[in-house]
Regions:
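The feature captures the conserved acid-bearing segment of alpha/beta-hydrolase catalytic domains
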Residues: 190-279
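Short beta-strand element of the alpha/beta-hydrolase
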Residues: 91-101
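Gly/Ser-rich "nucleophile elbow"/oxyanion-hole loop immediately N-terminal to the catalytic nucleophile
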Residues: 87-92, 135-174, 182-183
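Short amphipathic alpha-helix adjacent to the substrate-entry channel of hydrolases
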Residues: 107-126
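Hydrolases whose catalytic domains are alpha/beta-hydrolase-1, hotdog thioesterase
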Residues: 175-179, 203
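N-terminal Sec-pathway targeting helices
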Residues: 1-20
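N-terminal cap/lid segment of alpha/beta-hydrolase-fold proteins
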Residues: 35-91
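Alpha/beta-hydrolase-fold serine-hydrolase catalytic core, especially in secreted/extracellular enzymes
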Residues: 2, 29, 33, 271-325
Length: 325
């Protein structure tokens, strides 16, 4: 009997050791993956659209881009990363702050930031993977604007502080809404874009509650029609629903759109066939156009959104479009 118990003990010990090894290996693999770039540098070459304008703005701009990184004292932020046009010319560029989706960091999507900066923007991100409250976005904005005033900084005088956009995806969509509405520096932002921002009740349950009625800057909100964004269950106000309605159902976009006052330029639209995880790349073109229009005064980019003949209204890749300008 003692021999049997001894064998059982050895087996249990081996199983426990194996579990520990698997946990350690998985932790190491996760840590390595978290520091990897997840998409190729030329990811934008795969973008497809029937709209010449959307395809144009999903590509590269005219500027060569330089990247800088800064260590943050905030462990959640980890590193602040900045991409900007690498020109000898002494001039300022509009700023775009990107708020990460869940479990995503700027380091994982470097080509996305670099592509956007090539259109003449200072693009700012950080490595926070839980961004929904908007706090780290607000802190990151303060940090880079201080660099803009620091004569010893490589970024001294490069940022146009009168033109600052905020872009957020998924959880980061909630974070972007909070960034432009909840903080002392929220009034620095002049334009907002979100891709599949998590619906209001989901955000509240997760601790990222937002209030769209406080938005007073132009806002372009998007989502996908795929089941991960909209599962067809329109009940977004009850925690008792048996089926998850998706991260950003159409009902959520309608509610958020209607919750913003009519004097604010607002657009809601969905990417036909897009699943939640595809939204960052699927919206690249029109997100860039939205920023060019509002931050650089680009009239061609404005034609994507403004008027009865706006490009977005005739683009078969988009549906459920509602706008007030």
């Amino acid at each position: 009997m003692k021999k049997v118990m001894k064998i059982i003990g050895i087996v249990l010990l081996c199983i426990a050791a194996l579990v520990v090894v698997l946990i350690v290996v998985n932790t190491i693999k996760t840590a390595i993956n978290n520091k990897r770039v997840w998409i190729p540098d030329d990811y934008y070459t795969a973008f497809e659209s029937d709209s010449a304008l959307e395809k144009k703005y999903a590509g590269l701009g005219e500027y060569e881009v330089k990247e800088l990184e800064f260590e943050s004292e905030n462990k959640s932020i980890d590193k602040i990363r900045v991409w900007y046009p690498n020109e000898a010319e002494d001039r300022q560029y509009p700023v775009i702050l990107v708020v990460n989706a869940s479990n995503t960091a700027a380091i994982n999507l470097k080509p996305v930031y670099a592509r956007l900066a090539s259109w003449g923007f200072v693009v700012v991100g950080n490595d926070d993977r839980q961004t929904g409250t908007g706090e780290t976005a607000s802190e990151t904005l303060d940090y880079v604007l201080n660099l803009n005033k620091d004569e010893n900084s490589e970024l001294f005088g490069k940022m146009d502080e009168e033109h600052i956009g905020c872009v957020g995806y998924s959880q980061g969509g909630a974070g972007a809404i909070n960034a432009v509405t909840r903080f002392e520096n929220s009034d620095k932002f002049t334009v907002l874009f979100t891709g599949s921002a998590s619906y209001a009740l989901l955000s509240k349950n997760m601790g990222w509650e937002y209030d769209v009625s406080k938005i007073n800057i132009p806002y372009f909100m998007t989502a996908g029609t795929g089941s991960s964004d909209d599962a067809g269950n329109s009940d977004i106000h009850s925690n008792e629903v048996k089926e998850f309605p998706g991260v950003a159902p159409l009902a959520s976009l309608v509610e958020n759109y209607d919750g913003i006052t009519a004097d604010v330029f607002k657009i809601r639209a969905r990417v036909t066939g897009a699943e939640h995880e595809q939204m960052l790349q699927k919206t690249d073109g029109y997100m860039t156009a939205w920023m060019l229009y509002h931050l650089q005064g680009d009239t061609e980019a404005a034609s994507v959104f403004v008027g009865e003949n706006a490009d977005i209204l005739t683009n078969n890749g988009w549906q459920d479009v509602e706008k007030n300008k």
